[in-house]
């Protein structure tokens, strides 16, 4: 026992000497040890006596008396099948099945309870807005419901953060409409009221609905929801891409979309409007009719006017401009950036910059375009979110934290290769196709790069974009012919001797289901010009557009005078286009130079007149160019001619410049895109000769924009264009750029 005491003394723990007997010896004196030893001896003796008594009992009674060790053992054992170890190993699958059964049984029970009238949860949802709304502030749409004894609700066709869009039939106007139902919440109502104000402002300046902006018919309050009634439109461009299995549409069709979009942006840039859309993307560009290429821009819910910017976080990420990513002030140029991204996506089928977040987005932009200029990053509040400044003053892209994503070196993912300029288009899929030559792709690439300029101040503006050679038919190349469209506000002049001017234009841009307010071609309409009639025979179409009546956005550096000189150019049988040319800017610097004259003899002329192609002189583009316009059909597998011969002649008034004694003449021909259609079958082609005359020795440069110079003549004069559209069939037919695309009649919300 003494030994045990020593062991206990040097080991601060309890030593178990018998079942249920232990003592702690730390700090005990010898007397204490002896006392404990005596107690231990007494307990053992008592235990031995108990054992002897138990052994004297009969055998059966001994079994009923458990031994001391048996007292701690369980009297009954669980079923081995229910043991946790077995359930989590051998019977693991059974365990999971049981869990699922219990879970789904509870879920089903809750669902059944929810169906009952006594469900407090259901009662809570039903009380929103007297039972008309759900708990998300959205109106509960009921198919077949009739509103205000006028609108019959057909179905829900769209949903977003703003609310919902339903297809409805307007009994009063006997037409289908799309009704945008705003959430019953103050913040959404306030934003929607801004949208209504902007839409009404645009409608006021676009009474004939020819600028590719969705038409707001009316708005009203219904059961505490603001409702916006729009014309019914068709697919959006994302749906169109999906129908191509994301392989993209032809370059010809991309051109038609591009020209309409540039015209729409030119309209939004009108000084009285100055509207920034702030959310341009394929989903917000809708076809008017599933069989035509006319489009309209929708969803102005995020829009604002210049000077009234209220949001910093705008634009969908894939189409977000660098200035927005960098937290810099923005203007109308952000929409041009978005358009550049959209056009590439429409042709390649894939987003150009598909960032998963803002850092990834900027990194993908840098892959293609390189590091933004230092003067931009030096002023950008959020520059250090994406870049780091080197001691020498240059900027480099920050390394990603995770290190998992690897990007190509800045500027090495060339747009040239993405478009397949020299390799037959994206993925080589356009090799050998008409209208997809290297020259066509080079023009497209150049336009895109101008749209994707890092510097918003030098990014191409709609006015100049519409004059880009991508939209012009060339005489010496077989490009942009049968399906191309050139209705830009071109200022084109070439040598000849004539005194009259005319411009040819097709129509397009209306809803396929609504013809309200449309001015149609009048073949006998008399214009107030000295040159005769503008005659045209145009087949009736589901979707029309007209040449715009533009309050022209002036080139950079121009100011609007109090009494501008008017230059009137008649561009359509039923309307005229007036541009205001500031008198203070009419005397612009002249650049003298000689250029080669390209003569293009067309096969069809009125009265045997010889027509020369016009010569456009720019710093970048000096190829002869003419304009063509088409009005095709998307009828699959059929040839459909929608226009017959069209000839015209108009006269433009001349403007004179007196500050230096020289007299100048400039014609601003603004002829936005025709209602060119998605070519789903073989179509007849149409040729247009556009000729304008000027002094070959004097050219006028427009101040404020270094990239373009345009011709102007000295001395009073007139401009002439003689257009003749001929329908050619047989060998000249071109395969449809969208052959094989399935078109389904499933209208998309117009906003």
From Swiss-Prot:
<feature type="short sequence motif" description="Bipartite nuclear localization signal">
    <location>
        <begin position="109"/>
        <end position="126"/>
    </location>
</feature>
<feature type="region of interest" description="Disordered">
    <location>
        <begin position="580"/>
        <end position="667"/>
    </location>
</feature>
<feature type="compositionally biased region" description="Low complexity">
    <location>
        <begin position="623"/>
        <end position="633"/>
    </location>
</feature>
<feature type="region of interest" description="Disordered">
    <location>
        <begin position="104"/>
        <end position="129"/>
    </location>
</feature>
<feature type="active site" description="Proton acceptor">
    <location>
        <position position="279"/>
    </location>
</feature>
<comment type="similarity">
    <text>Belongs to the protein kinase superfamily. CMGC Ser/Thr protein kinase family. MNB/DYRK subfamily.</text>
</comment>
<feature type="binding site">
    <location>
        <begin position="230"/>
        <end position="233"/>
    </location>
    <ligand>
        <name>ATP</name>
    </ligand>
</feature>
<dbReference type="GO" id="GO:0004712">
    <property type="term" value="F:protein serine/threonine/tyrosine kinase activity"/>
</dbReference>
<dbReference type="InterPro" id="IPR017441">
    <property type="entry name" value="Protein_kinase_ATP_BS"/>
</dbReference>
<dbReference type="InterPro" id="IPR008271">
    <property type="entry name" value="Ser/Thr_kinase_AS"/>
</dbReference>
<dbReference type="Pfam" id="PF00069">
    <property type="entry name" value="Pkinase"/>
</dbReference>
<keyword id="KW-0539">Nucleus</keyword>
<dbReference type="GO" id="GO:0004713">
    <property type="term" value="F:protein tyrosine kinase activity"/>
</dbReference>
<keyword id="KW-0723">Serine/threonine-protein kinase</keyword>
<dbReference type="GO" id="GO:0006468">
    <property type="term" value="P:protein phosphorylation"/>
</dbReference>
<dbReference type="InterPro" id="IPR050494">
    <property type="entry name" value="Ser_Thr_dual-spec_kinase"/>
</dbReference>
<dbReference type="GO" id="GO:0004674">
    <property type="term" value="F:protein serine/threonine kinase activity"/>
</dbReference>
<feature type="binding site">
    <location>
        <begin position="157"/>
        <end position="165"/>
    </location>
    <ligand>
        <name>ATP</name>
    </ligand>
</feature>
<feature type="region of interest" description="Histidine-rich domain (HRD)">
    <location>
        <begin position="585"/>
        <end position="613"/>
    </location>
</feature>
<feature type="compositionally biased region" description="Polar residues">
    <location>
        <begin position="477"/>
        <end position="493"/>
    </location>
</feature>
<feature type="region of interest" description="Disordered">
    <location>
        <begin position="730"/>
        <end position="751"/>
    </location>
</feature>
<keyword id="KW-0067">ATP-binding</keyword>
<feature type="domain" description="Protein kinase">
    <location>
        <begin position="151"/>
        <end position="471"/>
    </location>
</feature>
<dbReference type="GO" id="GO:0005634">
    <property type="term" value="C:nucleus"/>
</dbReference>
<keyword id="KW-0808">Transferase</keyword>
<keyword id="KW-0829">Tyrosine-protein kinase</keyword>
<comment type="function">
    <text>Dual-specificity kinase which possesses both serine/threonine and tyrosine kinase activities. Plays an important role in double-strand breaks (DSBs) repair following DNA damage. Mechanistically, phosphorylates RNF169 and increases its ability to block accumulation of TP53BP1 at the DSB sites thereby promoting homologous recombination repair (HRR).</text>
</comment>
<dbReference type="GO" id="GO:0005524">
    <property type="term" value="F:ATP binding"/>
</dbReference>
<dbReference type="GO" id="GO:0018108">
    <property type="term" value="P:peptidyl-tyrosine phosphorylation"/>
</dbReference>
<feature type="compositionally biased region" description="Basic residues">
    <location>
        <begin position="589"/>
        <end position="609"/>
    </location>
</feature>
<keyword id="KW-0418">Kinase</keyword>
<feature type="compositionally biased region" description="Low complexity">
    <location>
        <begin position="494"/>
        <end position="517"/>
    </location>
</feature>
<dbReference type="InterPro" id="IPR044131">
    <property type="entry name" value="PKc_DYR1A/1B"/>
</dbReference>
<keyword id="KW-0805">Transcription regulation</keyword>
<keyword id="KW-0597">Phosphoprotein</keyword>
<feature type="region of interest" description="Disordered">
    <location>
        <begin position="59"/>
        <end position="81"/>
    </location>
</feature>
<feature type="compositionally biased region" description="Polar residues">
    <location>
        <begin position="59"/>
        <end position="68"/>
    </location>
</feature>
<feature type="binding site">
    <location>
        <position position="180"/>
    </location>
    <ligand>
        <name>ATP</name>
    </ligand>
</feature>
<keyword id="KW-0547">Nucleotide-binding</keyword>
<protein>
    <recommendedName>
        <fullName>Dual specificity tyrosine-phosphorylation-regulated kinase 1A</fullName>
        <ecNumber>2.7.11.23</ecNumber>
        <ecNumber>2.7.12.1</ecNumber>
    </recommendedName>
</protein>
<feature type="compositionally biased region" description="Polar residues">
    <location>
        <begin position="742"/>
        <end position="751"/>
    </location>
</feature>
<dbReference type="GO" id="GO:0106310">
    <property type="term" value="F:protein serine kinase activity"/>
</dbReference>
């Amino acid at each position: 026992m003494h030994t045990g005491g020593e062991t206990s003394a040097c080991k601060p723990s309890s030593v178990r000497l018998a079942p249920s007997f232990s003592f702690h010896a730390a700090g005990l004196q010898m007397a204490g040890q002896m006392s404990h030893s005596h107690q231990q001896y007494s307990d053992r003796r008592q235990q031995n006596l108990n054992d002897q008594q138990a052994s004297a009992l009969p055998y059966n009674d001994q079994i009923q008396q458990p031994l001391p060790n048996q007292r701690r053992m369980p009297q009954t054992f669980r079923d081995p099948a229910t043991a946790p170890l077995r359930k989590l190993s051998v019977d693991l699958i059974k365990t999971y099945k049981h869990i699922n059964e219990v879970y789904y049984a509870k879920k089903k029970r809750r669902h059944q309870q929810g169906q009952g009238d006594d469900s407090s949860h259901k009662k809570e949802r039903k009380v929103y807005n007297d039972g008309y709304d759900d708990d998300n502030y959205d109106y509960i749409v009921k198919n077949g419901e009739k509103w205000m004894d006028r609108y019959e609700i057909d179905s829900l066709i769209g949903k977003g953060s703003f609310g919902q869009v339903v297809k409805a039939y307007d009994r009063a106007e006997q037409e289908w409409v799309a009704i945008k139902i705003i959430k019953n919440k103050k913040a959404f109502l306030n934003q929607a009221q801004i949208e209504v104000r902007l839409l009404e402002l645009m409608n006021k300046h676009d009474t004939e609905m020819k600028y590719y902006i969705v038409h707001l018919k009316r708005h009203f309050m219904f059961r505490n929801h603001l409702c916006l009634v729009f014309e019914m439109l068709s697919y959006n461009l994302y749906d169109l891409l999906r129908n191509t299995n994301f392989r993209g549409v032809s370059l010809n069709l991309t051109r038609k979309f591009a020209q309409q979009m540039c015209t729409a942006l030119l309209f939004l840039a009108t000084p009285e409007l100055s509207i920034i859309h702030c959310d341009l993307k394929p989903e917000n560009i809708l076809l008017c009719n599933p069989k035509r290429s006319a489009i309209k821009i929708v969803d102005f819910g995020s829009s604002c006017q210049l000077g009234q910017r209220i949001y910093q976080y705008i634009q969908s990420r894939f189409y977000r401009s660098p200035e927005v990513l960098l937290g810099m002030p923005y203007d109308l140029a952000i929409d041009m950036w978005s358009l550049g991204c959209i056009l590439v996506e429409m042709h390649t089928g894939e987003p150009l910059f598909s960032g998963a977040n803002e850092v990834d987005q900027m990194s993908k932009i840098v892959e293609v375009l390189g590091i933004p200029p230092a003067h931009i990053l030096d002023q950008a509040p959020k520059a250090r979110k994406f870049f780091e400044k080197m001691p020498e003053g240059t900027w480099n892209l920050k390394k990603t934290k995770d290190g998992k994503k690897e990007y190509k070196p800045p500027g090495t993912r060339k747009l040239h290769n993405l478009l397949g300029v020299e390799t037959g288009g994206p993925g080589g899929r356009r090799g050998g196709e008409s209208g997809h030559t290297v020259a066509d792709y080079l023009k497209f690439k150049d336009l895109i790069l101008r749209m994707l300029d890092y510097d918003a101040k030098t990014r191409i503006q709609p006015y100049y974009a519409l004059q880009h050679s991508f939209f012009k038919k060339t005489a010496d190349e077989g490009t942009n012919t049968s399906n191309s469209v050139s209705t830009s506000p071109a200022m084109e002049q070439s040598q000849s001797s004539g005194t009259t001017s005319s411009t040819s234009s097709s129509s397009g841009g209306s809803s396929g289901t609504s013809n309200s307010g449309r001015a149609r071609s009048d073949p006998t309409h008399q214009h107030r010009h000295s040159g005769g009639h503008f005659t045209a025979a145009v087949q009736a179409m589901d979707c029309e557009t007209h040449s715009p009546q533009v309050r022209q956005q002036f080139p950079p550096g121009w100011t609007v005078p109090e009494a501008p000189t008017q230059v009137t150019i008649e561009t359509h049988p039923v309307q005229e286009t007036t541009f205001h040319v500031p008198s203070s800017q009419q005397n612009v610097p002249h650049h003298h130079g000689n250029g080669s004259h390209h003569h293009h003899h067309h096969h069809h002329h009125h009265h045997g007149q010889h027509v020369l192609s016009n010569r456009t002189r720019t710093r970048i583009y000096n190829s002869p160019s003419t304009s063509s316009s088409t009005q095709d059909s998307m009828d699959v597998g059929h040839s459909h001619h929608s226009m017959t011969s069209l000839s015209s002649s108009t006269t433009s008034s001349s403007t004179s410049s007196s500050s230096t004694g020289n007299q100048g003449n400039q014609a601003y021909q603004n002829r936005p895109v025709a209602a060119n259609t998605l070519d789903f079958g073989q179509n007849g082609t149409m040729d247009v000769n556009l000729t304008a005359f000027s002094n070959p020795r004097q050219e006028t440069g427009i101040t404020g924009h270094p990239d373009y110079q345009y011709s102007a003549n000295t001395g009073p004069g007139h401009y002439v264009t003689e257009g003749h559209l001929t329908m050619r069939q047989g060998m000249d037919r071109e395969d449809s750029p969208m052959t094989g695309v399935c078109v389904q009649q499933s209208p998309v919300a117009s906003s």
